[in-house]
Amino acid sequence: MAAKEIIFHDGARAKLVEGVNLLANAVKVTLGPKGRNVVLERSFGSPVVTKDGVSVAKEIELADKVQNIGAQLVKEVASKTSDAAGDGTTTATVLAQAIVREGQKYVAAGLNPLDLKRGIDKAVAAAVDELKKISKPTTTSKEIAQVATISANGEESIGQRIAEAIDRVGKEGVITVEDGKSLADELDVVEGLQFDRGYLSPYFINHPERQLAVLDEPFILLHDKKISNIRDLLPVLEQVAKAGRPLLIVAEDVEGEALATLVVNNIRGILKTVAVKAPGFGDRRKALLEDIAILTGGQVITEETGLTLEKATLQELGRAKRIEVGKENTTLIDGAGDKPNIDARVKQIRAQIAEATSDYDREKLQERVAKLAGGVAVIKVGGATEVEVKEKKDRVDDALHATRAAVEEGIVPGGGVALIRVKQAIAALAGANADQKAGISIVLRALEEPLRQIVANAGEEASVVVATVAAGQGNYGYNAATGEYGDLVESGVLDPTKVTRTALQNAASIAGLLLTTDATVHEAPKDAPPTAPAGVPGAGAGGPGFDF
């Protein structure tokens, strides 16, 4: 096992704070509409230019082991905030730095770190309650566009695209972001349920100009096994032919004699059919087939439920208004499923999302919710160079998450004003003792910091602006984009409540841990012998902190 170095007390905290400051100083320059860019080196390819706080934080790894521990803890603030709210990473970093900086002064002056932390926690809980009081729900497409615009560093075109996407697919729909192939941003919307499986034979195509097989008012047969024997299918094919409707077959696979017979009947015009493979694999395939069944009002023909192909009836088949099958995708439009059943299925999947431990599982479950409840929109981000597209794509991602957060918990005035109003509301909060009162004052001072940083990045005098905003009421604040004071909600400067709340809670959590840290253990440098624990009286021949 490698030798370890141990540092105690003020020596440990001072190094940790240095690491916090190094990371936070690099991240906070990106805050606000006039935030600056940070250039990130890449081992391969061109450097990345970004204004995304979490992207900057993730790149930082410090040479000094103890400083790096401090930096990694603040990186955790940014990452956790990004995971929970999708935005607010820079605000969280600025708040964490402010709480640590102010708290370190009190700890150095001899105050009890645990009481300081209790005071910090008490102030944050009161601040969160106050945030919820001043929050108001997002009701219009315009407000959604404004939230997205602010999160995208003031780029209105991004805000409009996201608002348009949400209008098209609904608040439950999935919106994904991809690299575009042109200079302009584009929006593609898939309405209905789409899955990534295409026709099993090009002979099913009936729209050659679009290379699609299109079925109007079809029946849908869902089966979880391979179909190779046409005799298994004959009873259901005869019933569908009598009804005079086309048929979509979704099964694990359709092959051999069964596929050949379907193709021949299709070419001769006896029965219009299309066969596709079921999406997904294993348990996920079963779940997706069940989703399609609920959406189309049918049942999955499976031995597990006692149903067989030979005995299948039209009542067990799903229905849809229209189905389009391409080489790689199948889209079901306007399924005939009952709304209560679809809602119940969505609720069930939501419960699974809440319990999911992996990001991949969560993402796939979220996709299933969207396909059942809304649709899928793809924003294709355009730009002149790869670097520009990457930077813009990061901002679109942030804006997208911010709008989701706004829909979830509502909005507050942006530009750091909400935290100033919260500060005023909890200014009279009392602690159980003087040390807790000091902890509360740490948070009160930190609540000004996002506004101070936004103003500093805009090249103005922070103290003057903070005093002017504090003298106002409600939504009155400073719009750094225009350099003017006014009602920020009216001028479209909004923040999602969830983003501001999450940033404050995560910042206080990590800052509290740092302030109550009294020792660090880290690997000793390979080219130096282990040293005595710093800050321990009488350690080694020369006293605290000396080599021995």
From Swiss-Prot:
Residues 537-548 have a biased composition (Gly residues). GO terms for biological process: protein refolding. One of its GO terms (cellular component) is cytoplasm. It is found in: Cytoplasm. Its main location: cytoplasm. Gene3D superfamilies: GroEL, GroEL-like equatorial domain, TCP-1-like chaperonin intermediate domain. Its EC number is 5.6.1.7. It is an enzyme of class 5 (isomerase). The keyword Membrane does not apply. GO terms for molecular function: ATP binding; ATP-dependent protein folding chaperone; isomerase activity; unfolded protein binding. Forms a cylinder of 14 subunits composed of two heptameric rings stacked back-to-back. Interacts with the co-chaperonin GroES. Together with its co-chaperonin GroES, plays an essential role in assisting protein folding. The GroEL-GroES system forms a nano-cage that allows encapsulation of the non-native substrate proteins and provides a physical environment optimized to promote and accelerate protein folding. Belongs to the chaperonin (HSP60) family. This is Chaperonin GroEL 2. It comes from Burkholderia pseudomallei (strain 668).
